Amino acid sequence: MLRAGVDIIEVGRIDAAILRHGDRFFNRFFTLQELIEAEGRTPALAARFAAKEAVAKALGCGIGAVGWKDIEILRDTRRRPEIRLHGTAEALAEALGLKEWSISLSHTHEHAMALVVAVG
């Protein structure tokens, strides 16, 4: 089985959400490790946000069926992005037989995008 998901977001939307909601925004959408790795850079947070949406699309459920923190976007030892699933997202991936994930992130000052592919 092959599944894919893609998402793009305006970085300004993330900036606006941070200004409007502050720590509540961070705590709702990102794990502590994601926040540490993003180093306060809004484009990096926007790319992670887009990646979570893309993973949910690849799972075939949309983000409403899984928790935002059930999908974690981190860096591996070579600083490449990687997907770690927890909770409902992990259970859904297992039920679909999805075992390997690949992710590509990109951002400018205006937009961030993510493409994910899962195979099983």
Language-model segments: which ranges?
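Core catalytic alpha/beta fold that binds nucleotide/phospho-ligands
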Residues: 1-120
